């Protein structure tokens, strides 16, 4: 009997990395792979809280496991320190991860590990693969332009379209497979595949969003979410809160529990009275489904790559407020190259927020950007269809790397 290939996936411990890794895992599972999805212990415990024990137990051939990261224990419902995680990835994670792979290889419940797929920021996974004589294939979860920027860190890309960036990367290293948007490829996972309905979220998702959206006029709602990491000063948070409250449009605002606790002085009873009946504040939601809802007309985002892809797939225009990493590059593409949005200034005020929302939802220029967003949606869908560039690259990845 042929042994299933066994892929061990190791995402960076942040929500924006966990989601695309799960999408890739499901795609590989649909192609006959046994999957082991590896979290650090902190996030494994958070998944227990948000998704329950049945989810974490996984499926017979799709397992969720954990290993210690060497960081101090914490009960906070928030992403760990990026500095601490980056340091641990360099200094303390290799040994425990190597031991985990050895246990997987010795287990009678799974085939031997045939490949390790670490996040681009979890390079110890490649070191472990090299030491154990196993195929190592890093997965970069952000944009091609972001990858290019990191690849040549001091040479920032200022000109060119995404395709030119991809061509430049492949000229340097031909073994780059551009398989996004994974959201659309994932939709092709067969209905009978047992992993199809798996989702991963470190926060409990609020189900009220869709009932509330169903009551709103099409294209009227501003959806606001700054991702799993971004933090604001109380002054910034106050400007956002009152800018949204006075913009004249209904809005859904995702405010993580850690951000909500830090800004209790802003989200007062008086504030909730001000926005009553025309706004919904939640701690987390199913973003892809919210963006796809006809009630949403505008996305106010930090321009993380997952959010960038999800808004393109939904065909929705944006206001960008980039925070870290390559988010400014993503914002530049969204606003300057693809022309589907505008960027807020770093020290944005409530008045600017009101002006930008009105420009995007009430002006002719806003309508033009909305039409552009629909054009980019069509291009994304075409890339993921049979014969499209992403579909073909995923087939090449399976044939040339994992089946080689």
Q: Which positions does each model-derived feature cover?
A:
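Glycosyltransferase specificity loop/lid
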Residues: 1-404
């Amino acid at each position: 009997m042929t042994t299933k290939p066994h892929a061990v996936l190791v995402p960076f411990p942040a929500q924006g990395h966990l989601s695309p890794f799960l999408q890739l895992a499901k795609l590989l599972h649909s192609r006959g792979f046994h999957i082991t999805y590896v979290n650090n212990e902190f996030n494994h415990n958070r998944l227990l809280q948000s998704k329950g024990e049945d989810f974490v137990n996984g499926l017979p051939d799709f397992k969720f496991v954990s290993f210690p990261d060497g960081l101090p224990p914490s009960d906070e419902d928030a992403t760990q320190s990026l500095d601490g995680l980056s340091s641990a990835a360099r200094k303390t994670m290799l040994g425990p991860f190597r031991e985990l792979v050895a246990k997987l290889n010795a287990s009678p419940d799974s085939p031997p590990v045939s490949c390790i797929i670490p996040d681009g920021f979890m390079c110890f996974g490649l070191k472990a693969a090299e030491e154990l004589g196993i195929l190592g294939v890093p997965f970069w979860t952000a944009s091609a332009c972001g990858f290019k920027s990191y690849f040549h860190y001091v040479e920032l890309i200022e000109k060119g379209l995404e395709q030119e960036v991809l061509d430049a990367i492949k000229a340097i290293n031909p073994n780059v497979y551009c398989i996004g948007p994974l959201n659309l490829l994932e939709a092709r996972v067969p209905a009978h595949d047992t992993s199809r309905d798996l989702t991963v979220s470190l926060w409990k998702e609020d189900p009220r969003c869709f009932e509330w959206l169903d009551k709103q006029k099409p294209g009227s709602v501003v959806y606001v979410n700054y991702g799993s990491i971004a933090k604001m000063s109380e002054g910034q948070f106050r400007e956002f809160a009152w800018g949204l409250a006075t913009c004249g449009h209904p809005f859904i605002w995702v405010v993580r529990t850690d951000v909500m606790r830090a800004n209790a002085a802003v989200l007062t009873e008086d504030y909730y009275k001000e926005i009553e009946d025309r706004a919904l504040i939640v701690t987390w939601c199913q973003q892809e489904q919210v963006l796809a809802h006809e009630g949403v007309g505008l996305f106010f985002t930090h321009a993380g790559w997952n959010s960038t892809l999800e808004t393109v797939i939904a065909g929705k225009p944006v206001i960008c407020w980039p925070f870290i990493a390559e988010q400014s590059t993503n914002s530049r593409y969204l606003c300057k190259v693809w022309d589907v949005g505008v960027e807020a200034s770093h020290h944005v005020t409530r008045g600017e927020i009101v002006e930008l929302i009105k420009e995007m939802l009430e002006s002719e220029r806003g309508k033009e950007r909305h039409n552009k967003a629909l054009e980019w949606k069509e291009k994304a869908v075409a890339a993921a269809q049979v014969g499209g560039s992403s579909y073909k690259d995923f087939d090449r990845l399976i044939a040339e790397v994992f089946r080689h």
